[in-house]
Amino acid sequence: MKILIKTANAYICVHDRRFIMVKEVNIRKVAVIGCGFVGSTSAYTLMQSSLFSEMVLIDADRARAEGEALDIKHGLPFAKPMNIYAGDYSDIVDAAIIVITAGAAQKPGETRLDLVNKNVAI
């Protein structure tokens, strides 16, 4: 894939001399996939950074993502305004950055290789 034109929020790409993509990117939008300990901490830190105006949280448990979005919104009085919400994969097609924190925790006696195989499935 080769990028022919790169602007502030659009990319035009070709592959094998064929046009394959024009993608609008919202440079002020970030997505966090996985709302466990790492994901929720990452989302809170991203909110505090004031780099983004929109954040989408995705988790296999939709209610957990909604709860984390509400919890993070409570910190907004100390940061710049941001639209934070639980969404799905269709909401992040234009995100500038996607942070993937989804994964299983390592159990006692489980090898790192076993954990990797489990996380590949996730």
What is each stretch, according to the model?
Residues 39-40:
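N-terminal Rossmann-fold NAD(P) dinucleotide-binding loop
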Residues 58-95:
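Conserved N-terminal Rossmann-fold NAD(P) cofactor-binding segment
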Residues 102-104:
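Conserved NAD(P)H cofactor-binding loop of Rossmann-fold oxidoreductase domains
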Residues 107-120:
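Glycine/threonine-rich flexible loop motifs
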